[in-house]
Amino acid sequence: MRVLVALSGGVDSSTAAALLVAEGHDVIGVSMRVADYSDARRGRSCCAPDDLEDARAAARRLDIPFYVANVEARFRERVIEPFVRDYVEGRTPNPCVACNSDVKFDWLLARARALGAKLATGHYARVERRGGRFALCRAGDPAKDQTYFLYGLGQEALRDVLFPVGDLAKRDVRAVAAQAGLPNAEKAESQEICFVTQGDAGDFVALRAPGSVRAGEIVSTAGEVLGRHDGVHRFTVGQRRGLGLAGPAPRYVVRLEPGTARVVVGSAGEASRDRFAVTEVRWIAGAPPPRPVAARVKVRHRHEGEEGTVTPDGGGGQVRLARPVRGVAPGQAAVFYDGDEVLGGGRIV
């Protein structure tokens, strides 16, 4: 079988390639160049200059062809520009979801099919056949599971996608990499947004959209002015740290008001929600279910999830949770699970 492997330069994707080579498949490595890194520092991100060289070195060790795909224009249009726009408008985007749906498993998958190949990545996730359909399932190692970022994959994508490390624990991945002699077997995990190579997300947004960033007031839910800030793009709903506010009780960001440049803060309870809407919903099965479905809902990657009900509504839906959850941030993904299976997900409104 011919397989195009998306090599990020990290140990996970390199090990995925090593496993496929060991199984005797015709493996081709490809890395994506997503931005101009001429002035970038080395960081713990993916897809940066050093990562491309690490991917090239891994491919050389495995003796497989290696190519670099320049996807800068597509990445800028589908990931970076929406990322900046969301922050300016008071939302908290998830660029990894957009990258997976609109670049990796769209653009790269099309290239794989043109080569008569499957597409493999180093994601910690599994694909199973269940009742005549493909199911996206949690990874064998719950601590490394990345299905939250993959809810946008539909049946056609899952048919041609492989996750070779999906059943492995991280320590086992490193062991396989070491045994294969991969030069990045002990490489640190990526922690940053790959295209934010200097400063943080707030600095990046301020640099890309300086005319849209405004200083403003930090106010209580009662309207009392408590402090000032240099832009709503530096905050997210549910945030506690970095507010710069003194007081006996902790305060959390309740909502962002980009129109008035106000950051509204309150108690943990005020920053919690048990009902919210989602838009741009994608269902793994294809069509939305005909009636409300019970699901465990994750509102961010590290969230354990809360039991709830999802009611489809056209291309969106309504979510009702059994208990209020702090930090249900507009712009973030809400992903719906039935046991270990991903049902779908959407953007929080």
Swiss-Prot record:
What is the name listed in the Swiss-Prot or TrEMBL entry for this protein? tRNA-specific 2-thiouridylase MnmA
Q: Which SUPFAM superfamilies match?
A: Adenine nucleotide alpha hydrolases-like
Q: Where in the cell is it found?
A: Cytoplasm
UniProt GO BP: tRNA wobble position uridine thiolation
Give residue numbers for the site Interaction with tRNA.
123, 332
Chain segments carrying region Interaction with tRNA: 144-146
Gene behind this protein: mnmA
Q: Where is this region: Disordered?
A: 300-320
